[in-house]
Amino acid sequence: MEKNLTTGSVFGNIVRFSLPYLFSYFLQTLYGMADLFIIGQYADASGTTAVSVGSQVMHMLTLMIVGLAMGATVTIGQAVGARDQKRAARYTGNTMTLFLVLSVAVTGLLLALARPIAAVMSTPAEAMSGTVAYLRICFLGVPLITAYNIIASVFRGLGDSKRPMYFIAVACAVNIALDYLFIGALHMGPAGAALGTTLAQAVSVAVSLAVMRSARGGIALTRDDFRPQRAVMGRILRIGVPIALQDGLIQIAFLFITVIANRRGLTDAAAVGIVEKIISFLFLVPSSMLSTVSALGAQNIGAGKPRRALQTLWYAIAVAFGFGVLISVVIQFVAEPVVALFTHDAAVVAAGGPYLRGYILDCCFAGVHFCFSGYFCAIGRSELSFVHNITAVVLVRVPGAYLTSRYFPATLLPMGLATAAGSLLSVIICVIAFLVLRRHGRLLPGEG
């Protein structure tokens, strides 16, 4: 189960680790779309709206759990790189204890807040009951979502990105089958979609636990490893909490941008919604690079090989930025046809084309600052990732979207460029932070 990422070709390790991670992200995207697609075949608009609103809430929650779990990936990865099996076991056991307690506490809170959350999302009255039912059932599955992401983080910290891909593939297949059963055959509506999702997560967790117990070359856990240790849990949270907060606040910012677009009218709102879906798919590459740099960088830092960790960063930036430049050039020529894949409304296509041409530049800049974020996590400085992302959101993304929407009512192009400008600011902050850390000799955990 454990894979040594501290030897051999750096670029080869990046490719071998990132491709399963990329496919995992793709499957998670497919997993999230399945409920919406299937209920659209069997339910009315209120049912579709309920699942749409509920899935947005669950997407934000899942991203925050994944961000929090980054603390486990990095700390376990550093221990594995240092060949310290006892420390790796201690971090693994404490991670499981910590997240079990947190998930149970959060589940109780979310169940009590299901209806207020649906209200905050401005859910239409016709879809309110379905949305609340969807959220309550999905909230019951929060411990399962947490368990899957923790197990996946443990595997990735060990250098294995393939098994988490298999686990999400199992969940995706089971979810689709159960959706057709509960929504199509049993006509359970949004509640059926939520039940299918939750049971699919349960199956995935069961499979992942079975694999974890039977895998050779893994971490041997003892009862003492699960006993809470303040220093261990504190380090996991110091890395994970900034990433979780960052991901949650970024999603809130995107909701603000959606509100701004909605105020421009139905056509522009539809165009922005479609382009966001396209961009979220293209961002799978930068996202996989972030996670790859975190895992590979952590192992190499733990092994006392900071030069290899830096090489991982530079190679990943080259891949992500190269992809961004390529896709940005292509989109300049095919923006309208790409938008037209999602709608036959000529007005929406005409509005979405310019927005996509501006927004697509974000792929170039995001590819760079995502990789820096992964590196900052690997060296235990995830607060830097939080700072540059939130600064960009507060100073550029949201105000830029508002101002361009107000002063350029005839086109969405400036609004798309405002988003890319936010990522450019993030890149500038990341480069400055990196240079400052290097000048003061703080590119290793605990230095300075």
Predicted region positions:
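Transmembrane alpha-helix boundary and packing residues in multipass membrane permease domains
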Residues: 21, 25, 37, 74, ...
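Short alpha-helical transmembrane segments in multi-pass integral membrane proteins
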Residues: 1-18, 76-143, 185-241, 297-362, ...
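Small-residue-rich hydrophobic transmembrane alpha-helices
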Residues: 48-108, 145-164, 271-335, 366-385
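Generic alpha-helical transmembrane segments of integral inner-membrane proteins
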Residues: 22, 26, 30, 34, ...
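Residue-level signal for short hydrophobic patches within transmembrane helices
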Residues: 7, 11-30, 34, 57-64, ...
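Short runs within selected transmembrane alpha-helices of multi-pass transporters and secretion channels
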Residues: 138-156, 164-172, 193-208, 287-290, ...
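Helix-terminus/linker motif at the lipid-water interface of multi-pass membrane proteins
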Residues: 30-49, 118-125, 181-188, 248-281, ...
